[in-house]
């Protein structure tokens, strides 16, 4: 969607995977969906080094609303859990240099059973969100037909645009239509949405992460061309810092989401996050790669019989990112290859930085064999910058070194 927004994948925090539809604020006040939860997460994002790295969206998900609309038919937040209202919450978030995302559902009800946005309510709800000062809308698709979705998702894009407020638009439409052509028209999606959920919701497990990785890379030829500045494929939230992933698996999710040019929307408790999870999510070089201005989605380029996979993402200034991923379950695996085997141009030399360890290999030539040691369900990730390209010139003076553009 060419609305000037989401020129790099959106980054921030999203309530759903970790906090779900917990509305029991009497017995569980710190974990329930309430204004306090979002205010506390905004404080953590602003004060614990997240905002400076680019994490800026505070995303409300389902179960924020009252069970009924008001007398004028407007959506209203639950008065007990959001006593100050959404506008006050938006002001609180904006005062910390952050942005607020809200959740709606194109249909009779939201997935959690709260008031949905039927086709006759689209303009009204867009106006309400704009008046509240919302910066992003995630529009889900429970309780609506394919026909209603085909009408409603483009209708909401127009309605948001006509409010005059810049609002990033996240569409769940393709996930409800199986995620693939011909049922999903990605050309149209790129024109009406800034990002879209293609596939299943992530759960707090490695199996869930793998199923998402499998689906996205199996279908990469269909999906990859449609990602770019202003329009992104969304494989769903980062679950790093929760319960289901090991340390290695957490590093793998971060690396693979970065290769995919995926939105980095964390869903974890930032008040209690472990130092090791925080370090993964706050890796500067990783975020720089994710936020690369070209916005090219990476691909799986090798799938070995040894259960090693290699992924490549082209970056600006002729740089690239490589991920070596092990699906093995036995022990650390020594994987030997060369940049030539991975399709890099001959005669080039690269400065390589390991994204997690920070170690640098200087002057790695395309033809040189190298070995990486990859832990079970783990990754090794490299950032590569060309040093120079050796070009044989016919001019006097023999070969000259020209920078690789």
Swiss-Prot record:
Residues the record marks as carrying a glycan: 161, 185, 369
UniProt-annotated binding residues for substrate: 61-62, 138, 172, 197, 201
Keyword Disulfide bond: yes
Subcellular location(s) per record: Lysosome
Primary location: other
Catalytic activity: Cleavage of non-reducing alpha-(1->3)-N-acetylgalactosamine residues from human blood group A and AB mucin glycoproteins, Forssman hapten and blood group A lacto series glycolipids; a neolactoside IV(3)-alpha-GalNAc,IV(2)-alpha-Fuc-nLc4Cer(d18:1(4E)) + H2O = a neolactoside IV(2)-alpha-Fuc-nLc4Cer(d18:1(4E)) + N-acetyl-alpha-D-galactosamine; a neolactoside IV(3)-alpha-GalNAc,IV(2)-alpha-Fuc-nLc4Cer(d18:0) + H2O = a neolactoside IV(2)-alpha-Fuc-nLc4Cer(d18:0) + N-acetyl-alpha-D-galactosamine; a globoside IV3GalNAc-Gb4Cer + H2O = N-acetyl-alpha-D-galactosamine + a globoside Gb4Cer
Active site residues per record: 140, 201
GO cellular component, one term: cytoplasm
One GO MF term attached to the UniProt entry: alpha-galactosidase activity
Keyword Glycoprotein: yes
SUPFAM superfamilies referenced in this protein's UniProt entry, alphabetically: (Trans)glycosidases, Glycosyl hydrolase domain
Descriptive protein name: Alpha-N-acetylgalactosaminidase
Organism: Gallus gallus (Chicken)
Source taxonomy: Eukaryota, Metazoa, Chordata, Craniata, Vertebrata
Gene that encodes it: NAGA
